[in-house]
Amino acid sequence: MSTLAFAFAATENGFELRSGAAVLLRHSADAPAFELGIGVADVDMCRGNFRIEDDLAERWALDCCEVSGGTVRLWSSQRRELSATVQIHTRGAKAQLEISSESDAANRIWIHFPREASESIWGGGEQMSYLRLNGRRFPFWTSEPGVGRDKTTDLTRIMDESGNAGGDYWTTNYPQPTWLSSAHYAVHSNCAHWSALDLSVQGVSTYACWTNNLTLEFFASYGLPELVGMLSDRFGKPAPLPDWAIGGAIVGLKEGAASFVRLEKYADAGAAISGLWCEDWVGIRQTSFGRRLFWDWTWNAARYPDLPAQIAALTERGIRFLGYINPYIANDAAMFAEGAAAGFFALKLDNDDVALVDFGEFDCGVVDFTNPAACDWFADRVIGREMLDFGLSGWMADFGEYLPTDIRLYDGSDPMEAHNRWPVLWAKVNADAIAKRGKTGEAVFFMRAGFSGVQAHCPLLWAGDQCVDFTRHDGIGTVLTAALSSGLVGNLVSHHDVGGYTSLHGNVRTAELLHRWIDLGAFTPVMRSHEGNRPDDNLQIDSSPELLAHFARMSQIHARLAPYVRHVLDEGQANSLPAQRPLFLHYDAPEYHAVQDQYLYGADLLVAPVIEANVTGRHVAIPGEGWADLWSGKPLNMGQAWFDAPHGKPPVAYRLDSSFVTLFAELRKEFG
């Protein structure tokens, strides 16, 4: 077996970086790997949706080089003053490349990597549309993902006309400049500025970054599980989820005090309930978008008069109470004056006034997490006192993508660079708040926004705001792609809003959608429902006896799977593998490289949810031998298998050699 150790060597007119037989980087005068340029960014933000353009003045290939040991000096034969120094360090199955421009004017870097025709590329953070990235370009900039995310649809066009809010296949709350290859190597860029990976040209992968210096890290392994593990170890692991979070459904209701009355309908129907999530615990602000929240992070006694006593009563029944928070404070909130007086908000560029951001018919200040005192205040005074001390066991830690690029930060950093780092700072504030109260591993927060390094702080991703439909780029199926792609770059656990969220322009839930999403939710680590942005316009789980009975059944299945899920999560902590895995992670064959509509749930379950409307079943790829249908026990052969899929029985298979085969047999007997 060839060695995986990286090797750097000079060639006749350039150099190469290799791992085994694979060439990861090749530079020559005829085919330069590096370019420098000079550009000016043009950025416009409307409610978290960004229009970003580059006024590029110059772009030159660095076609000349001198190699001395692990140091390379590069320059352009056309403009010699455009030059850079590259340092390459190799250490076994890892390597590091540092490039620094020697020209003060240069602020754009392009790096070209060779790519074999047979290679598949994955990663990029949490991608919603495509698991296999080949053939497309993916910018890395945290933002709202948009509504519709498909330029061919009427909904996307309507949303684009209203604040550039339609999105596209690449827009995501959680981008990350990290990619993996089926050739068993990975590349990570430490650049937090705007960057992009372009895979649209056959045979080459081009990474562009708006900076004059950056570091690339290379990883190599004999197999994909080991490669994913290396990335997980690189970015760090958060605290494991507590048992309560994986043992039944977290019911999302936001009807004030009536939420507790409605919860009893779920309990009476037999639902296994682990939590009640009331994001409106802070009060309501009605907008044209729908029912939104009042962003003052404290209990709203008018909406929930008896909340302390009700939380205590739930706790006695083994049910946790969860709430909502985000890193902004409305300028008409009492807490805003407190933060402003202490200097805890980001400021305008031209004066010391708080920079206000439009969030859609209300304005907010941005808590400045580059200020350590502001971080401590938010972690202790806000999350600690108002939430954890009050009795909350968890919360949605929303947003993090809206940092404007035209504000002034406490530490003097460039907002263009701080923008992508903001979700990581936000995650750390939440994790620190929990740690300060001694509740690490007991309290849980979940986030949609992310960037490189969020893995170490956030215990639970949430796939953001899907439309309440089956559409290809913004519907139920995107949560599968989100979980699989984010898992490849070191995020161990993902989940989603059961039922979807965004309902606009007549797009409302159907009973079929709710049934299918409930089925999917039961086979994810955390099963949490959401009423959506317009609850009164949409079907809810308790809108009909049939929906409620179905939810109760599937929540019971979710609770019964808890021992297996705990095993999977423990395995993730030990071996750095995500709970939901692409088929190719354990069955490394080209035919599985683009499969994103089914997943391995741990190593022993294969889940293939129905994510299309008006179908009664689906074909499922069975990878390898030794599988059986969970509901019938019928053995399955490798290849394509047809599954009937009535509501309540999504296509699921289990390994016949699993140590949990008894649990799966009990599930079949009880629910089959």
Residue ranges of predicted features:
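Flexible loop/turn segments at secondary-structure boundaries
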Residues: 187, 194-197, 253-258, 282-287, ...
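Generic beta-strand/beta-sheet core signal
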Residues: 251, 274-281, 300, 322-326, ...
